[in-house]
Amino acid sequence: QPNDDDARASVESSAEPRLPLLFPAGLAATADRLYVADTGHHRILECNHAGRVLRQFGMGTADFVDGELDHTAFRRPQGLSVARDVLYVADTGNHALRRIVLRSGRVETLCGNGRAGEPVAGPVTSPREVALNQPQSVAATDNEVFMTMAGDNRLWAYDLGRGALACRAGSGQLESRDGSGPMAAFAQPAGLAVVQQTLYVCDALGSAVRSVQLRNDVVQTLVGQGMWEFGDADGPREQARLQNPQAIALSADAPVLWVADTGNGRLRSLRL
């Protein structure tokens, strides 16, 4: 009987793309695959763990096209997240949330019209009529896809069952402030990770790592002192300093967050 790899091989590209990576800005991993957002080439690559390219999603030119495998187009895609054999993509340059059905390779737009605009909470009846504003990172669960929206400094969620958008946290103002829902504020939220009922967010201009409790949308700063209070220091949370953190991931075997402290050129760990 053919296994999943055999079935998937039938839709793999016959040759590896010749272009090197150009500003890769997103990564997602499964037990046997790596997915890379090759941002500068406007494409998504599916690789095995040895680094061999198996499939390319997107023609490699900046455009906004749904459809099958390499007949599709992205524009500066960044954040990636996998859930239930679906790859979710923050298509930043198209101001859209998109998904790739991995078994077939089909690319679909969940919401976004290709232009920056003011997102509106509510049901999404016509995906291409919904405005987003620079979605940068995504984190998917079985039921929701969470997005950091760098262009409007808020955290949004797309409900996969209802097909609806909701703002989970953030006032929209460029600030770094704890609180609940719209009473909280972010300063260009970037990297995102979801663990059970908690979201962890890199607040880039706030030089901070923040948490969001999904039960009540309460935002709390774990590390960071606020906008312009950046630095380069290890130590207890109240003394540690970051600068423009961009990416975050949870350790698989310990309660530790790994943080790409981009402005300092460091990889830091934060014990929860």
Label every PLM stretch briefly.
Residues 36-40, 89-93, 147-151, 201-205, ...:
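Conserved beta-strand positions in repeat-built beta-propeller and related beta-rich domains
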Residues 244-272:
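Blade-level signature of beta-propeller repeat domains, shared across WD40, Kelch, NHL, RCC1
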